[in-house]
Regions:
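A short helix-loop-beta-strand connector motif used in the catalytic cores of GNAT acetyltransferases and
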Residues: 1-6, 10-17, 32-37, 54
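Conserved catalytic-core motifs of GNAT/GCN5-like acyltransferases
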Residues: 34, 92-93, 105-126
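Hydrophobic adenine-recognition pocket in adenosine-nucleotide-binding enzymes
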Residues: 58-60, 93
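Conserved short alpha-helix immediately C-terminal to the canonical SAM/SAH-binding motif I
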Residues: 73, 97-100
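Conserved GNAT acetyl-CoA-binding A-motif
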Residues: 74, 81-93
Length: 141
């Protein structure tokens, strides 16, 4: 998985993405507010069952990895959650994706179990799942 999948989504206009001219794409993320069936069938237990955003396709250009770009993208995601008064960010990863697991844990995500995908071409594939609770400033409520 990488930038080609995201560009494909932009071309299809999936996830509400719009194509624009860029000099260079440094990184991408897809934030999905949709409730996803595999996330409701977790083998484990989420921290919360409240509204959540799912992170898909977090990717950074390989030429600039380890420069904090992914963390900045994640910080943007958290700000979007705060704007929308959403307390939880959830995501999944391949079991053997050690760099992603390390990145998530370094950025405050915790492991909560496994799910099995329900969409082609990955039906039945296991993913490990993580969740992070966002601290929303009290004055927003």
């Amino acid at each position: 998985m990488g930038i080609s999948y995201v560009l494909e989504d932009i071309e299809k206009n999936e996830n509400g993405l719009k194509s624009e001219s860029f000099t260079k794409i440094l990184g991408t993320i897809v934030l999905s507010p949709k409730k996803e069936m595999p996330y409701s069938k977790i083998e484990g237990k989420w921290i919360t069952n409240d509204d959540y955003i799912v992170i898909h396709r977090l990717t950074v250009d390989s030429e600039i990895k380890n420069k904090g770009i992914a963390t900045k993208i994640l910080e943007f995601s958290e700000k979007e959650c705060i704007k929308n008064k959403i307390l939880s960010i959830k995501t999944d990863s391949h079991e053997n994706n050690e760099p992603m697991k390390k990145f998530l844990e370094k950025n405050g995500f915790s492991y909560y179990g496994v799910i099995y995908l329900d969409r082609e071409p990955d039906i039945g594939e296991m993913r490990i799942v993580y969740e992070k609770i966002i601290k929303i400033p009290h004055k927003l409520f």
